[in-house]
Amino acid sequence: DGVLTGARFITLAGARAFIGTDDRVVVLDLDDPLSPKVEASWPANKPTAVAIQFRYAFMTDSSGFQVIDITDTKAPRAVSDASIKLDDARNVDVARTYCYVAAGRDGVVIIDVEKPESPKEYARYTDNGLINDTYDIKVASTNASLFGYVADGKNGLVVLQLTDPERVPGFYGFSPQVKPVVIARKQTAGPALSISKPLDRDRAVDETGNQVSVFGRLGSRPFNLEEMRKMFLTERGKVWTVE
């Protein structure tokens, strides 16, 4: 029925696929991979990317950055007043309490999503204008430091150090304050357009509750999706909150 006409990207999150088309993002249920089913969709203005973390989808489109509540994936909801205007948002990655947007000539735009329904622009980083054609960014940790790997189009690959013990107090914390600085560059044969996703280590289950690692203790297992949802949803499917 043409629901995927104009498909331009796909983001996998467990047994679900989020596919961007010309005017919306479509959620596919891939629990039976040979019989995919359309679960839901939400409107978007030429979406370019989606990053998934817990109950939220962080989307970039021609309007900029937008937060979508996917607590119920059958009824995704754009969070009102949870958007940030960006001129050329091309891709997005999320790592704990920060989203990293590949923003073309504006370089890397870092957005604070500690409160996902109230995102705030944290910083724009261009290395004094040298990062100016950003197509993609992926964030990963090596040992105890956080790095950003940037596909900067005509400028090739750029590596950012985001945290380190010398510049970032509390860098061992859950989500320390990030302070980007360029530590390496590599000119590529052609424009650098994309960065592959790194390995997710120490991960027990995927976004749909499927076990992805083997535990080293006899009889142990991670919680499944139903068990996890009971920790943050009431019997009526509402999110637990405190006043």
Role assignments for model-derived ranges:
Residues 1-243:
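Feature marking well-ordered beta-strand scaffolds used for ligand recognition
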